[in-house]
Design a protein with these regions (language model features):
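Short beta-strand element of the alpha/beta-hydrolase
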Residues: 156-166
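Alpha/beta-hydrolase active-site loop
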Residues: 211-233
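Short alpha-helix in the alpha/beta-hydrolase fold that links the catalytic acid
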Residues: 367, 378-391
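Accessory cap/linker subdomain of secreted extracellular hydrolases
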Residues: 267-364
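Central antiparallel beta-sheet cores of small beta-barrel/beta-sandwich binding domains
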Residues: 21-87, 93-100, 181
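Catalytic active-site module of serine/aspartate enzymes centered on a nucleophile-bearing elbow/loop
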Residues: 404-408, 412-443
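Short beta-strand/loop motif that positions the catalytic acidic residue
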Residues: 365, 371-373
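N-terminal cap/lid segment of alpha/beta-hydrolase-fold proteins
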Residues: 114-155
Length: 443
């Protein structure tokens, strides 16, 4: 938030000093239908952390905390947000405002226990019945850190590299309280397949590299992982594949096309098979519909204009100016909202993704391909992308799973499938079984 520091200072000046309130404890409330819990402590200094259980997010550390009488001010840099609240006379409620671009009224009430962490029955727990090794490998001047797992029995194993979706993620592809790659690696290794999963650039033990990295740059990281597997004597170098989720699926396609002698098979989990711009336009429509707020014709036209503007851009400064002009004309957006959106949409990664066309690579993919999608995936639409996969890769095995979302989780309804963190299952058991069966069928 550009003026967050000033806003924080002004809120402090507006505070009313009264009595010494008791803010220490656990406080629950709801912001935009999402339950949240603040944990407030004071051991000589104030400390606040935040949980969003439904999103699977816990222990989000807050920044500066100021308490003056009955008023508390909490800065949340990780969320680009501020909370200001006034405690009731009985110390049982806090009446406040959650400010994140817009101001949302919220009432916090005391709770005697911390937010319940959702059960994750598939998350692997030691002791493991296979070998696990922390490893590093290099891609030029970038060091990537990961975990290599292999079965105890056998001397040379089929192997896969796991490649995560968009956004910097750790080796477990940890999101919404789930660890999909940890679950996949555990399942595959228990069934005789070696697995290498690694931290994305700038996460965990991996070095950051350039801020301008695009999908094509990240594809070279995945190939460095393949090269690492090829260097190991315990790997069957004629059976090394890439399993990519979302953007990672596109990376698998790119590397299968450009390194046909090194990539023996690929599996795309909700991988894009159409242009990035078409993915994003469809995603916007589906997300709005599933949230019960379908786009009007004018809103749909605005979305398309923004994406087409990015696709046609050749200069980042001019693109930012063009996006600013479009957004200023399409609604009541705050300056903060506009600038945050432009920062994302004019970034090298986003621009490159919009322009990236899998059709450039798909005709060159000759290795075996398993393309998988869930029917309730609103981020990478199954009909749109599996249809393209069938058309461009007639030799591919294509599977659509009814009632599964972008993470291949089952849910009770299409709308509920959007709440990844609220679903206990990390990934469908049937999907895991099909992956193992398909890999083992590759001779």
């Amino acid at each position: 938030m550009k003026n967050r520091g000033l806003l924080f200072a002004l809120l402090i000046l507006c505070s009313v000093i009264s009595y010494a309130a008791d803010f220490v404890g656990h406080w629950k409330g709801t912001v935009a239908n999402l339950p949240i819990v603040f944990h407030i402590s004071n051991d000589s200094t104030w400390r606040v952390s935040l949980d969003s259980p439904q999103q699977g997010a816990f222990d989000i550390l807050c920044g500066e905390v100021v308490v003056k009488g009955d008023t508390i001010l909490i800065d949340m840099p990780a969320l680009q947000a501020i909370f200001k609240g006034v405690i009731a006379q009985d110390d049982k409620s806090i009446y406040g405002t959650f400010i994140q671009g817009i101001a949302i009224p919220i009432v916090l009430t005391r709770t005697t226990k911390e937010a319940s962490r959702l059960n994750r029955p598939q998350e692997p727990q030691p002791p493991f019945v296979y070998h696990s090794q922390e490893v590093t490998f290099n891609n030029g001047d970038i060091t990537l850190a990961g975990t290599f797992t292999k079965p105890i029995i056998g001397s040379k194993h089929k192997a896969v590299v796991l490649v995560s979706g968009s956004g910097a993620q750790n080796r477990d592809e940890e999101l919404f309280g789930h660890k999909p790659f940890a679950v996949i690696a555990d399942y595959l290794t228990r069934h005789g397949i070696a697995v290498l999963r690694y931290d994305d650039r700038g996460v965990g033990g991996s070095s950051k590299g350039s801020d301008d990295a695009t999908t094509l740059d990240l594809a070279t990281d995945a190939m460095a992982a393949v090269d690492y597997l090829k260097s190991r004597k315990d790997i069957d170098t004629t059976h090394i594949g890439i399993i990519g989720h979302s953007e990672g699926g596109l990376i698998a396609v790119i590397n299968a096309a450009t390194h046909p002698d090194d990539v023996d098979f690929i599996i795309t989990l909700a991988g894009p098979y159409v242009m990035g711009k078409d993915i994003l336009i469809k995603q916007n429509h589906l997300a709005s519909e599933m949230a019960g707020m379908p786009l009007s014709e004018s809103q749909a036209a605005d979305v398309k204009e923004i994406i087409e503007t990015i696709d046609a851009s050749t200069d980042s400064i001019q693109l930012a100016a063009d996006l600013r002009k479009i957004m200023s004309a399409t609604g009541n957006h705050s300056e903060q909202e506009v600038e945050q959106t432009i920062k994302v949409m004019a970034s090298p990664w986003y621009v490159a993704f919009v322009k990236l066309d899998p059709a450039k690579y798909l005709p060159q993919v000759k290795c075996p391909v398993l393309a998988m999608n869930g029917s309730w995936d609103f981020q990478v639409d199954a009909t749109q992308n599996l249809g393209a996969a069938r058309k461009t890769l007639p030799h591919a095995t294509v599977k659509e799973y009814e009632g599964l979302n972008h993470l291949f989780q089952p849910s009770s309804s299409r709308q509920a499938s959007m709440s990844y963190g609220a679903i206990e299952i990390t990934i469908s058991e049937q999907v895991l079984k099909d992956i193992v069966e398909w890999i083992n069928s590759q001779k």
